Amino acid sequence: MLTQTPICDFGKKAIPFKLKSTEGKIISLEELKGENGTLVMFICNHCPYVKAITKDIVEDCNELKKIGINSVAISSNDPTNYPEDSFDNMIKFAKKNNFSFPYLIDETQETAKAYDAVCTPDFFGYNKDLELQYRGRSRELKNLIPIRDGKSDLYKAMKLIAETNNGPKDQIPSAGCSIKWKFD
């Protein structure tokens, strides 16, 4: 089911976390913090909306790194009901797509809940003070095909954050598959 992100809650502080990466390391938000901003992305392996923009995400994150913005991807989906989103498949997905940023597993789903993440992809763009400035889309999709007419909305927003510490006032929500929550 297609789910859209809510509007940006400007200034909301990033929630600290410590999660395991596909490299087997425990990584914290504090370690990831970029000099000019931090991009936290909730993604997964199986969602067609994520798959459609994975190349764009990787390219954007590589470019953002050059301007002092660090990026991290987190998968919070329930791998029991969605085996394609298992930790082993996360490792394969990160390697296949040449992730230059950490890909973390949120096994308890506490991080996704703390961030109020709703879908994959769900982007949280923070300034250098870890204050939320962007909660929009990567770029426009038409029939799950990215419209590549210049830099992505995500890149432009994060570049603005790096330059001014503030995100764009007008943001188009991200849309994708709902997070696959565990049910006890």
Residue ranges with predicted function:
Residues M1-A162, G167-Q171, S178-D184:
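Chalcogenol-based redox active-site neighborhoods
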